[in-house]
Amino acid sequence: MQTFLPYTSTLACAQGLDNKRLNKQILEGYQILNILSGKSKGGAWRNHPAVLMWKGFERGLWAYIEAMVQIANLRGIKTENNVRNLKALHDQCWETWGDNRPEFWNDEIKVMRIVTTHRANLFNKDPMYYAKYQSAVTSPYNSPCCPNKKEPCKYYWPTHEEKNAMV
C-alpha cells in the first residue's frame, strides 16, 4: 500500500512514475479512499501509514488520483474500470471527505524527507528508470522513520512520527 510522492505537485508525481507504478497508484489510491470512506473494512491496512497519512485529507488524495488518471490516459493506459469505481465512490462520499492537503505539506523538513525517501525507494525499485533519483539514496533527507525498529521503515511517514511522539 503506497502513494508515491517524489514531488510536491500531484501532477509532477504522476509524470515522474513509470507506467506500472502509475497504474497501480490509481488502484491503491482508490483502496485507501475506500478504507477512509468506511466502504471497506481494510483489515490491517486501515492502520497503514499510507492510509493514516491521508485520513481527513481525502480530497487531497482525490487530487492525487486524478493526476494519476490524467497522465495514465495521456500514456494510453486503460483506466475505465478504475475511473468507474472512483466516480461511484466520489459521488457517495465527496461531502464527507476532508480538506485538500495534509498539514505536513507546510513543514519543509517533513516534505523533503517524504520526497527524498520516496525517490530513494523508487530508485531502488528500478535504477534504470529512476536514475535521476540516485542522489536521493545518499541525501541527508533520506531518513526514514522508526530506525530503531526490528525492521525499520523504508519511508518517512509523518504519521509514525506523530504516533511515536504520543507514546
Segment roles from a protein language model:
Residues 1-45, 51-167:
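Sequence termini and other peripheral, non-core segments
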